[in-house]
Amino acid sequence: MKIYLVGGAVRDSLLNIDVKDKDWVVVGSTPQEMGSLGYQTVGQDFPVFLHPKTKEEYALARTERKSGQGYKGFTCYAEPDVTLEEDLLRRDLTINAIAQADNGELIDPYNGQQDIIDRTLRHVSDAFTEDPLRVLRVARFAARFHHLGFTIAHETMNLMKVLVDSGELSHLTAERVWQEWQKSLSSQHPEIFLSTLKECGALAIVLPELNALFGVPQPEKWHPEIDSGIHTLMVAQQAALLSQDLPTRFAAQVHDLGKGVTPESEWPSHKLHCHTGIKLIKRLCDRVRVPNDYRDLALLVCEHHSNIHRAAELRAQTFIKIFDKMDVWRKPERLAPILLCCQADHAGRLGLETQPYPQKQRFEAAFDAAKMVEVKEVVAAGFKGQEIRDELNKRRIEAVKDKLDIK
């Protein structure tokens, strides 16, 4: 029985990245032996165990043979005669197929260390094409390590395209699609996840609403980048620079979905995209099972971003109507991420990335003024029933007028 540290922990240590989780592979053992040593069984599809003290995962070395469709269509063999090299061979990328012995020796049969030096994401073997999830995983790693200079090997991109053409991606569950997408949101360059899926053809299958944006023009006066898909990638990048919050980053990526269904006869104008986008976001979130907090923020950004961009032109009562729809009186924490998404939208335009966005400060000032008007003051003044609501609105409008010097 031999135990090796494998996968992400070895890779990240070689990249001088803090190691958060450790995974281990056990060669030459059985489930019975692991159980007798106090390890707890947790794997349903293949033998995985939790260490009795550290609770880290220990998996028996295994091979996998394609026996069906999708990422679950595999038959596993995890007997004591499976070698470490055979276990590493089934892994997706060479940088994830390096093991470390307890004496520190690195076992690297597929040249993962060289690919780390070369900053290359490369498949281990042609068996890569047997698992459709790997297309999304490689896209996520491309996003995660983009800031370090990693790119996808040409041969690996070709295999990703083969996987897409095979139809296997249609067997991915909503949960796995969202899991990879959500993980990509935490990277420094989440836009690379989307652009990689676009390049290999997977975006049209797993996220068709986003794919539909590419090739759709916008007015060059406001969008020098013209293409709605390119704009979306730029907004995703700007959102990542502005906020670490994942729902904010998600909302920025999907805020313009309505542009993908604008009739060609109306191009490059998209006057109704804030309304048509609502339905598309709901459909996307239902299908991919996006959490409600992500969904709710995305819907608010989609509905209101065009009006927020027009902050300098808005009447005081329009500010109050928007605040009412956002329900920021009860949920004031909503306003900041909505405005950050709008700022990212504004900055996500070719050559205009550093242009100031005073609309954000104007909305913040309007809300600060309006929320100073308290219900108890209106009630104390003798108003009752519907009168309270009407007077509250009236006072809030006046407060915004005074603060923003609106005539």
From Swiss-Prot:
GO molecular function list: ATP binding; CCA tRNA nucleotidyltransferase activity; cyclic-nucleotide phosphodiesterase activity; magnesium ion binding; phosphatase activity; tRNA binding
Identify which cofactors the protein needs according to its UniProt entry. Mg(2+); Ni(2+)
State its Enzyme Commission number(s): 2.7.7.72, 3.1.3.-, 3.1.4.-
Q: Name one GO biological process term.
A: RNA repair
Q: Which reaction does it catalyse?
A: a tRNA precursor + 2 CTP + ATP = a tRNA with a 3' CCA end + 3 diphosphate; a tRNA with a 3' CCA end + 2 CTP + ATP = a tRNA with a 3' CCACCA end + 3 diphosphate
Q: Which UniProt keywords apply?
A: ATP-binding, Hydrolase, Magnesium, Metal-binding, Multifunctional enzyme, Nickel, Nucleotide-binding, Nucleotidyltransferase, RNA repair, RNA-binding, Transferase, tRNA processing
Listed binding positions for CTP are 8, 11, 91, 137, 140
Give one Pfam hit by family name.
PolyA_pol_RNAbd
Q: SUPFAM superfamilies recorded for this chain?
A: Nucleotidyltransferase, Poly A polymerase C-terminal region-like
Q: What does the entry list as the binding residues for ATP?
A: 8, 11, 91, 137, 140
Q: Can you tell me which residues bind Mg(2+)?
A: 21, 23
- Domain named HD is located at 228-329
Binding note for cofactor: Magnesium is required for nucleotidyltransferase activity. Nickel for phosphatase activity.
* Record-stated family: Belongs to the tRNA nucleotidyltransferase/poly(A) polymerase family. Bacterial CCA-adding enzyme type 1 subfamily.
Q: What does this protein do?
A: Catalyzes the addition and repair of the essential 3'-terminal CCA sequence in tRNAs without using a nucleic acid template. Adds these three nucleotides in the order of C, C, and A to the tRNA nucleotide-73, using CTP and ATP as substrates and producing inorganic pyrophosphate. tRNA 3'-terminal CCA addition is required both for tRNA processing and repair. Also involved in tRNA surveillance by mediating tandem CCA addition to generate a CCACCA at the 3' terminus of unstable tRNAs. While stable tRNAs receive only 3'-terminal CCA, unstable tRNAs are marked with CCACCA and rapidly degraded.
Q: How does it assemble?
A: Monomer. Can also form homodimers and oligomers.
What remark does the entry add? A single active site specifically recognizes both ATP and CTP and is responsible for their addition.
Domain description from the entry? Comprises two domains: an N-terminal domain containing the nucleotidyltransferase activity and a C-terminal HD domain associated with both phosphodiesterase and phosphatase activities.
Report the protein name in the record: Multifunctional CCA protein
